[in-house]
Amino acid sequence: MEQLRAELSHLLGEKLSRIECVNEKADTALWALYDSQGNPMPLMARSFSTPGKARQLAWKTTMLARSGTVRMPTIYGVMTHEEHPGPDVLLLERMRGVSVEAPARTPERWEQLKDQIVEALLAWHRQDSRGCVGAVDNTQENFWPSWYRQHVEVLWTTLNQFNNTGLTMQDKRILFRTRECLPALFEGFNDNCVLIHGNFCLRSMLKDSRSDQLLAMVGPGLMLWAPREYELFRLMDNSLAEDLLWSYLQRAPVAESFIWRRWLYVLWDEVAQLVNTGRFSRRNFDLASKSLLPWLA
């Protein structure tokens, strides 16, 4: 932490009195910055253990801001370490507001907020990929089911190189079965790929604490082009998330087969987390496994 504070002080040309970690995950941390007088600065720093990720997310955030109707954090710069080891750091605007996870003051305000969120999402989802699919650092011309099968195979191969993953033999059997059933799970799929946020959940949105108006979206993921249904699978944590999901589907329906593919996406997203960070949500993995079983028979 002290090394990061010194490097940020040098980069910004102002001695920081302290930096405070406000959110930490296995591969990234978000830091609040305080000037020499101890006052909070109007920018924050997000550090990444994976080289190149800060630069990729800077580009993605800027693209979403340019292509959409909702505010995204302004990107002020990227700090990399090419001569000595250290985390890459993304410098971005400190946004005001509270998470959309906080309940709205009235049911009417929640309905209005949902409408604003859906409209903001659809502004991105109207941007067609023209046949491209994939993440910021690896896009290709392909059909989504084919790309996703490649994605699953890479995760499966990588997973089998590790010991002590925390997965049981039953977990492995479920994963193996989903690989076998991919053609059936994607049967009849014909949706185009579009521009997506890539990490869409209630925590990735900020609202005004008094008016419950949508202020901004934050924390995008590296996935760039994917079908609309792939944007929605993370809306599963609670009743508010499920309510938002169904509001989107009423406005812009997706294929009925999303009923089972959402759990396929949840399952393999947890595998991706495990492969990339060494951690995964046992709750999400088990829920997805149980929900998929009727379609794996």
UniProtKB/Swiss-Prot annotation:
Protein source organism: Escherichia coli (strain K12)
InterPro entries reported in the protein's UniProt record: Aminoglycoside_PTrfase (IPR002575), Kinase-like_dom_sf (IPR011009)
Taxonomic superkingdom: Bacteria
Pfam families, sorted: APH
Protein name in UniProt: Uncharacterized protein YcbJ
